[in-house]
Amino acid sequence: MTGRILLAALLAAAVGAAHPVRAAATPAHIDALEREVQELEDVRAVKTLQRAYGYYTDRALWSEVADLFADDATIELGADGVYVGRPRILEYLRRLGGGRDGLAYGELHEHLQLQPVVHVDKDGQHAKARWRDVGMLGQYGKSAAWSEGVFENEYVKRNGVWMILSAHLYITFVAPYELGWARLKPTDDPRTQVAKDFPPDRPPTVRYGQFPQVQLVPFHYHNPADARGDKAKAGGDSDAANDPLAAYERRARLLRDHDEIENLQGIYGYYFDKNLWDEVAKLFARHATFEDGQRGVYVGREHIRKALQLFGPQGPRQGQLNNYMQLQPVIHVADDGKTAKARWRSVMQLAQPNTDGQWGEGTYENEYVKEGGAWKISKLHFYVTALADYSQMWNKGPIPMPVASAVLPPDRPPTEIYRSLPGVYLPPFRYAHPVTGQPIDAHAPADTVLGRK
């Protein structure tokens, strides 16, 4: 039984004779709902595919990695050039891994696949996605390094199975752990030795310098704030309480809203990384609020745009690193599909020219609203957990959060007074426990410095 016939049968059984108006679901409704569900499944399949790439790469399972690619696929990592076809991809990756499958004793080769922004084409056979790749690399007793970069990938569905068609990793930096990213120097030839000994099939598609040089990876998507019209494919005005078909449509719409909010916040992070403040500001609703740590609350899109200058001037600059990774979302969309809330984690990698760089980590508690058919941020509140000089790390070098600017004062004071590490403030949970259904009644300790609870 085909998916369409099965869906029609299920809907007919669900609707039944008790709902004569829609007892025979129209072909148009069935087609729309089928496309909606299929696209949602495709997005999840693409995410699973890329995450499998990361897990296999972690353990140097090169045959398994290569099998994720289409026969005519390409891979391009950094400045090494383009390798074409699964056999060439396998040999290239194996050589990068030291000529063997599996890790050597004491080897660390973690490649986290984070912050996806996934779009499936209308044909349902092709997709594009942007991912952040964070590497923790090294050999026990010998070396340790960090790496970070951005994938802009393409995918293809063949015989019902999603595969990687093009993997292109733009490497931001590879840095020895002790030195850190802030003290890296430009290099004339960023190619690996493998690429020199095992030349690619094609030269690099783009040439760029790794950090501290400026790098802006092309976006495969437009700013979602520029979208117009309601995106709900299978939605309608039917009464879900009295119409089972409408209930299916509503469930599909809420799933789509969840994906669009995840894309929105991921896009926010990618724009924020490069100080693209004009694009960041567009992601906010007209009367939104923005609160970062103890800087206070900025109200309205125009004032938020000005406040973003507190993080540096518009656009990327040489020697500046402003990575704000958007991770670990817990998203809840309201039943009406018009508002949503989400909790996120952010890990920060920061640097300014001629500094040691900084580490940071924190939690977002955000709210969203659908405005003009597009999801936008209505409230962004970032709670800083820790901020530290890279050379000192958390145990020795935590530094205080910035406070309200005298040059560009906020519209309101901070909604909560707290200290980052060594303080242990707990941002309140806006959602119930997913198993017990009970609210999380956990409280932060009193701030002994400021006397506020």
Where are these regions (language model features)?
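Bacterial N-terminal signal peptides that target proteins for export
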Residues: 1-7
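Bacterial N-terminal signal peptides
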Residues: 8-17
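Sec/Tat signal peptide C-region and signal peptidase I cleavage site
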Residues: 19-23
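Short, low-complexity N-terminal intrinsically disordered segments enriched in polar/charged residues
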Residues: 24-55, 59, 67, 215-270, ...
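Intrinsic disorder/low-complexity detector
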Residues: 30, 185-250, 400-453
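A solvent-exposed, acidic/Ser-Thr-rich amphipathic alpha-helical stretch
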Residues: 62-133, 277-348
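Short, surface-exposed coil-to-beta transition loops
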Residues: 111-113, 146-151, 324-326, 358-364
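Short beta-strand edge/turn micro-motifs at domain boundaries
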Residues: 126-128, 148-184, 339-341, 361-396
